[in-house]
Amino acid sequence: MAIKIYRPTSPGRRHHSVSSFEEITKSRPEKALLVSVKNDSGRNNQGRVTVRHRGGGSKTQIRVIDFKRNKLDVPGRIAAIEYDPNRTARIALVFYTDGEKRYILAPSDLKIGDVIMAGENAEPKSGNALPLSAIPTGTFIHNIELIKGRGGIMVRSAGAAAQLMAKEGDYALVRLPSGEMRKVRSDCSATVGQIGNIEHGTLEIGKAGRNRHLGWRPTVRGSAMSPNNHPHGGGECRSPIGMTGPKTPWGKPALGYRTRKAKYSDKLIVKRRG
């Protein structure tokens, strides 16, 4: 992927960069693999805001992605690399030999015409999905399952890759992109390779309108609000927040206060991120 930079014809263009989309080979998605979902604008089923700063944006259709990779021992040919407006990674359209079509996350070195397969007997090459027990130590992987058969939930964004560090008994040790070292059951599957669109992290938004197209609304400072909307609100003009430390909109300590809840699976984390 290459980054396209514009001439500074306006303040928004000056710091504006986009993907060249040179790896995209098909402009229209596969109709049978599309699902329409109503934009909820960050609201739950009661209409209350559960995620702030969401709303608007361009209409999109959901591409049904095969995160489970449960079509075992059936070869599939890569027919196209496509853009997906709902994620940062590119997706690949796979034609299986039995006639079925599916979308998968596209690894960086996947090309049209490549043959991929899922299963314990698959070769550990880019795009193939195998149990962690069948993947050589040191291999870069993505789309990692935490519970066997439920589909990959970790390492799915553009340019991401985890590394299989070791295997011991029923567990494999995986280093995640955040630096966290975590044990995962060795019968859980993962896909070999690094996810494509590697330079996505270097893109510059450039202007507020582009974020609105992506469905992101403005973020207002708490000190600019009234006191009934935020702990930092109120006062005359540029007043200090009036407390010893910053607070969230719900009155909890912000910036450095640990909010991660304890989970049963925390015992599988060998080393925290950072």
UniProtKB/Swiss-Prot annotation:
SMART domains: Ribosomal_L2, Ribosomal_L2_C. InterPro entries: NA-bd_OB-fold, Rib_uL2_dom2, Ribosomal_uL2, Ribosomal_uL2_bac/org-type, Ribosomal_uL2_C, Ribosomal_uL2_dom3, Ribosomal_uL2_RNA-bd_dom, Translation_prot_SH3-like_sf. Gene3D superfamilies: 2.30.30.30, Nucleic acid-binding proteins (2.40.50.140), Ribosomal protein L2, domain 3 (4.10.950.10). The keyword Transmembrane does not apply. One of its GO terms (cellular component) is large ribosomal subunit. Residues 1-23, 222-242 are annotated as: Disordered. GO terms for molecular function: rRNA binding; structural constituent of ribosome; transferase activity. Keywords: Ribonucleoprotein, Ribosomal protein, RNA-binding, rRNA-binding. Disulfide bonds: none annotated. It comes from the Bacteria. Part of the 50S ribosomal subunit. Forms a bridge to the 30S subunit in the 70S ribosome. HAMAP family: Ribosomal_uL2_B (MF_01320_B). Belongs to the universal ribosomal protein uL2 family. This is Large ribosomal subunit protein uL2. It comes from Dehalococcoides mccartyi (strain ATCC BAA-2266 / KCTC 15142 / 195). The lineage of its organism: Bacteria, Bacillati, Chloroflexota, Dehalococcoidia, Dehalococcoidales. The gene is rplB.
